[in-house]
Amino acid sequence: MILANDELKKLISTGRLKVDPLAPDTVRENGLDLRIGGEYAIYAYEGAVVKPCELENARHLFRIVKADEVVIPPRNFVLLTTEEYVKMPDDVVGLANLRSTLARYGLVIPPTVVDAGFEGNITIEVVNESPNTIVLKRGMRFLHLILVKAEGRALYSGTYQGQRGVTPPKGLRGEC
């Protein structure tokens, strides 16, 4: 069941869902609109051979940029972080979507689930499929998070729990 405006406001007012900072236009009809944070990550190299199964982490492959504008080259991608620090209830899952207006410019994100019990800034991959450089501004609404009631409870305990700022991917050594 998708949680609508009234249910979202109840979760926030009772402290079960935390969104900090909470702007007046964050809670929407059927989800939360989250904003671009103050840093992003982009690949530091082009043409490198990346072998996730051989890496402990991939931080060295990315350049972290602190800026008021996010520059996404044509047919490239960046990792964006939300301005908001989110703490999810243990029985609610988030489904992340790019705001449709941004998709109409050629931006896409992969299907992304924010697990029940997750806490942190959300890092999301944004791909520019267009032939043009696209420039986004810090603080603009970019991510629409649909919240869905889960059957039962779960507690997220993954690598990205408690992350702050943009977080490059972990390596997959030991998982392959």
UniProtKB/Swiss-Prot annotation:
Record bears the keyword Cell membrane: no
Catalysed reaction equations from the record: dCTP + H2O + H(+) = dUTP + NH4(+)
EC primary class: hydrolase
CDD domains in the record: trimeric_dUTPase
EC number: 3.5.4.13
GO biological process: dUMP biosynthetic process; dUTP biosynthetic process
One annotated GO molecular function: dCTP deaminase activity
Keyword Metal-binding set for record: no
Keywords: Hydrolase, Nucleotide metabolism, Nucleotide-binding
Pathway: Pyrimidine metabolism; dUMP biosynthesis; dUMP from dCTP (dUTP route): step 1/2
Active site annotation, chain numbering: 125 (proton donor/acceptor)
Binding site for dCTP: 99-104, 115, 163
Residues spanning the signal sequence: none
SUPFAM superfamilies: dUTPase-like
PANTHER family: DCTP DEAMINASE
Family to which the UniProt record says this protein belongs: Belongs to the dCTP deaminase family.
Subunit (UniProt): Homotrimer.
Reported function: Catalyzes the deamination of dCTP to dUTP.
Alphabetized NCBIfam families for the sequence: dCTP_deam
Protein name in UniProt: dCTP deaminase
Species name: Pyrobaculum islandicum (strain DSM 4184 / JCM 9189 / GEO3)
